[in-house]
């Protein structure tokens, strides 16, 4: 067991990590141009945060959280999702007292005890954005635009944006009554989870993936028919913003998301080429969450995107992440004096920004050059006693085999100019 990672976790090796670095770099670029600032929250929180924030009727709270009692007797839970910790930090550090809105993003590991499957692990990584303090539907459209921009820049074009409004506490109260009346005659046929949802948050029965529950709910009354004037106006406004950006979308009354805190907007982005595993992003508005977690009454909207699922989607669509270029220079050496000299030279060139490698295995010159090829070096030099004495080396272009004699002092500038 010491040499095997726990079930539901995965090592990201150098052969894969470049893909993560590429996506994370693109995320940071996009968030920067949209004005989002990075936030980093702890890997664990007080359990109450998720109970109040995520909702006690959710699968996350009821089945999936990693919760333990620490040595101080406190109930602690590993980060199960990114929004609630961001809200907690927003409140704790009085960010609500600053000029609003507050626009945050994060890339973070999250932990859920669920059955490991393709694109879904017990430790996975989530990219999310949050806008706190903006009630206008333009904020909803903006977070959707961030997600769509990322996916399109990665080459995913066959996307389907599905939107819904789940209302507010006022209109949802009326709808919940209508929905419960509709469901009560078939209550015995609902799955065990939905029987619990029926009592606590009946709206979430619509989110169930169990076939028997879907058959029952396919003719359920639509929440969009029960929206109050404010929620209806907000939903119509969102559609205007999506229209002006040129985004196609489908109004799907079944989109309610798996967390209890959503109000008004709920959305999902689906890669149509994948099918059941095709949801790559989901989010929405949560106007009561900040107050529920102990802060002032302020609105919020955001999304979460699983990076493992995103990478799987790219792979299944045949989209390859660009591999990093090879190193700039490999320095081979012959002799003990050159061994020390090239160590110092490599260190100097690295300090000045060149990607440089040299041999640390005491290989023969032939083996060193073979190693340079394996590292995909752009250039190579060989330094021995004569090169040190003359202060000159032959700079070899490893792509075409051409060589040019230059002074050792010229190496850095010559490579940077090519």
UniProtKB/Swiss-Prot annotation:
Could you list this entry's UniProt keywords, alphabetically sorted.
Aminoacyl-tRNA synthetase, ATP-binding, Cytoplasm, Ligase, Nucleotide-binding, Protein biosynthesis
Quote the CDD domains the UniProt record gives.
Answer: HisRS-like_core, HisRS_anticodon
Top-level taxonomic group: Bacteria
Q: How does it assemble?
A: Homodimer.
Question: A Gene Ontology MF term for this entry?
Answer: transferase activity
Mention any Pfam family matching this sequence. Answer: tRNA-synt_His
State the compartments where it is located: Cytoplasm
UniProt lists the family membership as follows: Belongs to the class-II aminoacyl-tRNA synthetase family.
Check the record and name the InterPro entries matching this protein: aa-tRNA-synth_II, aa-tRNA-synth_II/BPL/LPL, Anticodon-bd, Anticodon-bd_dom_sf, His-tRNA-ligase, HisRS-like_core, HisRS/HisZ, HisRS_anticodon
The protein's matches in NCBIfam families, at most eight in alphabetical order, are given as: hisS (TIGR00442)
Q: What is this protein called?
A: Histidine--tRNA ligase
* Enzyme superclass (EC): ligase
Has UniProt tagged this entry with the keyword Cell cycle? no
- Cellular component, GO annotation: cytoplasm
Q: Which reaction does it catalyse?
A: tRNA(His) + L-histidine + ATP = L-histidyl-tRNA(His) + AMP + diphosphate + H(+)
Provenance organism: Thermoanaerobacter sp. (strain X514)
Q: Does the keyword Aminoacyl-tRNA synthetase apply?
A: yes
**Where is this protein primarily located?**
cytoplasm
Q: Name one GO biological process term.
A: histidyl-tRNA aminoacylation
| UniProt-listed Enzyme Commission number(s) | 6.1.1.21
